[in-house]
């Protein structure tokens, strides 16, 4: 019942993003980006933790479209499944052309960019292991700490464990030095 009630608004949201995209890229208008990411330094070597806001928008457009496809499947809306599956392919193809270099690197080499690309399956399966390794390398380069903000953080440990990096996920989870999830607890925070 809830899915039936919300289906129209889900479809309207995906249609809004589609209408406001250009050449299958949602890179127009205002986008927040990854809010409250940790920025320890920016040494001008491409290690800044700032993730391209349009890469983020494209990733979440794909995710929203996938959720709509899932809902359409459950509700037996075969025409919508077909239509939005075609759209999803175009969204991911445009992502590859715009945000992935010919040698398989993301143009935005941040933890959030890697996490979203992997969590939302934005990349061909052949590229995923190397991108997962780049994520781990980035985490280690920052002293085994996260630099993700609100948009990358919820998926970080899931992506690490999905690609076999349980040890890194546990190190991040159990870290109690700033920045970390346990630092506020160690400092006596109660919320």
Task: Describe the role of every protein-language-model region.
Residues 1-191:
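Active-site core of glycosidic bond-cleaving carbohydrate-active enzymes
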């Amino acid at each position: 019942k809830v899915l039936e009630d919300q289906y129209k608004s889900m479809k309207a949201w995906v249609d809004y993003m589609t209408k406001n995209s250009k050449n299958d890229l949602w890179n127009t208008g205002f986008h927040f980006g990854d809010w409250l990411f940790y920025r320890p330094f920016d040494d001008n070597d491409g290690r800044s933790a700032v993730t391209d806001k349009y890469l983020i928008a494209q990733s979440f457009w794909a995710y929203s479209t996938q959720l709509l496809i899932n809902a359409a499947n459950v509700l037996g809306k075969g025409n919508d499944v077909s239509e939005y599956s075609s759209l999803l392919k175009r969204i991911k193809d445009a992502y590859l052309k715009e945000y992935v270099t010919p040698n398989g690197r993301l143009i935005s080499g941040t933890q959030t960019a890697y996490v979203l690309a992997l969590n939302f399956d934005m990349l061909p399966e052949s590229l995923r292991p190397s991108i997962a390794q780049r994520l781990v390398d980035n985490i280690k380069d920052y002293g085994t700490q996260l630099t993700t903000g609100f948009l990358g953080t919820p998926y970080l440990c899931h992506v690490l464990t999905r690609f076999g990096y349980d040890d890194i996920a546990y190190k991040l989870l159990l870290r109690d030095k700033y920045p970390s999830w346990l630092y506020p607890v160690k400092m006596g925070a109660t919320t």
